[in-house]
Each structure stands twice: as C-alpha cells, then as structure tokens.
Amino acid sequence: MSVIDTNQIDLVAPRISEAGVADYIALLKPRVMSLVVFTALVGMLLAPGDFHPVLAITAMLCIAVGGGAAGALNMWYEDDIDGQMTRTANRPIPRGRVTRPEALTFGITLSFFSVMTLGILVNWVAGALLAFTIFFYVVIYTMWLKRSTAQNIVIGGAAGALPPVVAWAAVTGSLAVEPLLLFAIIFFWTPPHFWALALFRNDDYARAGVPMLPVVAGQDHTRLQILLYTIVLVAVAAAPWPLGYFSAIYGVASLALGGWMLVLALRVYRHRTGSAALRATRNLFKFSILYLFALFSILLLEVVAKAVWRLFA
C-alpha cells in the first residue's frame, strides 16, 4: 500500500503568499520544539566525555531545526485535517497565510540543512539519527500511520522519543543504555498523554477522519489503555534507579511524580461521563506535560550539581 495520498498533491496554480515571520515560526511547532530541545539537552549533558561548547550549541541548534522541519512537513501534509479541526484550524496553511509549496520547500530545506550540518560539523552517527527521526515522523507517522491505524501515536511516538538519543550520539558518536532509557520513558509517556487529549477532542478527530483510539475503539477502551500505559510508564521511568543508571534522588522523584500521574489515570478510568470525565482527562493531559518536564529537570539538575561539585571540590 502506498503511503502517499495523491489528494495531497497540489494541482492548482500557486497564489501570492501572505506569510510573515510569525507564520514560518508557527510552522516549526514551537511548543513541540521546546520539548524536543529540552529532552535533547538532558541527553547531551548526561553523555560522558568532553564536548566543545561550540559543537554543543551547533548540535542543539541542528536538533531543534530538524524537529521544526519535521513539524513544517507535517503541517504541509496535513493541511486538509488541520482545516477541519478546531485545535488546528488557525495554523498558517489552513488560514491561507502560507501556501503548501512554501511549507514543503521550507521543511525540506531545513531538514537538509540540519542533517548535513550536524553530520559534517559534529558526527555522522548523530546526523543519520536526526535524518531517521525526521523521516520517521514525516513518512512513517504523518503519511502512513496517522490515517491508517488507531495505534498511530504508539508507533509514531518513537520519533518524539529520539531527540535525547541524537544528542547523546552527538557527544559520543555512539549509543548506550542511558539514552535508550530516556527514549523508553518518552515512548511510554506518549500514549497516555495524547490519548487524554484525544478523549476531550474526540469530536475533532472524528470530524477530520483521524482514527484515534477513542474514535475507533471507543472511550471506555481508551481509558483502560491510558491506565495500562501509565502503569508501564511509572515502572519504566523508575527502573533506571535500581539498575544503577540514575540516582536515588531521581528514583524517589520519579515514583512520586509517577504515583500522582497514576492517580490521575485512575480518575480518567473511573469517571466516564459528564463534567467529571472531562475534568479528569484535562487534568491528566496537563499534568503529563509537567510530569515529563519535571522528570527530565531532575536529571538536568543532578548533572549541573555534579559539575559544580567537581569545580569547587
């Protein structure tokens, strides 16, 4: 089966663009990019060895630009969906601020620039991983999985989990257990996060024809899956502590954060109708963002604290 939707090909004459700088910034999905940059930064700082500050900044910029490029290509391909959903109707392409050819050119240019710069100036292991991340998000997730299976964000979540792996490879030129643990945390965090969103945006996804789990399997089944994935997430996030990769401070914090996320997931499972159900899903969605940032912030603070201790010891 082809992953290319021929309906997405532009057959009309190009029109004059009204795009401004803000529109092109919006194409980069700044909120998503902030998560990409933050998790990548943690992966980079956890990596062993010395890394020149100029190369570190270069690598972070390339990862950020690569993530933004993937977002632009996602918007290029999904303009038909975005125009039908309340949450995305104000994006630059549905609003007519940016044309599809402009978004495509913008995304491809940034993708090429970020991958080549990272490969040439840093190393090609990181460059290849960044290229794979962009490819996976744009082709595997956006063009194929999102429109074809209710497991779209489960499999597609791998793309969002790769930035810390890319950043680790930028420092070391190789892979190790630690970045794969970070990958696993983000990977198992993705389903409960996005399914909570899908529960209170169910009508949006149904109207656009996107086979999100609540649309295909129903809300009750989705609530069960959220609970099951949250249980797995809590275990996976805590595992690096007893395995000796992360500290006891991280371990205790991960259990505390995970415990509260599990409580919120249980509320989503129990409250299935009315305002209580809506409030439960919104609370889980909001906390899931805080959960991931807090978990990675603890790792970041530990790295900084160790560096300061070595400096003054």
UniProtKB/Swiss-Prot annotation:
EC category: transferase
Catalytic activity, as annotated: heme b + (2E,6E)-farnesyl diphosphate + H2O = Fe(II)-heme o + diphosphate
Parts of the chain that traverse the membrane: 32-52, 53-73, 120-140, 153-173, 180-200, 226-246, 248-268, 284-304
Keywords from the named record: Cell inner membrane, Cell membrane, Heme biosynthesis, Membrane, Transferase, Transmembrane, Transmembrane helix
Example GO molecular function: protoheme IX farnesyltransferase activity
Source organism superkingdom: Bacteria
Compartments where located: Cell inner membrane
Transmembrane helix keyword on record: yes
Xref: PROSITE patterns: UBIA
Designated gene of the protein: ctaB
Organism: Rhodopseudomonas palustris (strain HaA2)
Disulfide bonds: none
Protein name, UniProt field: Protoheme IX farnesyltransferase
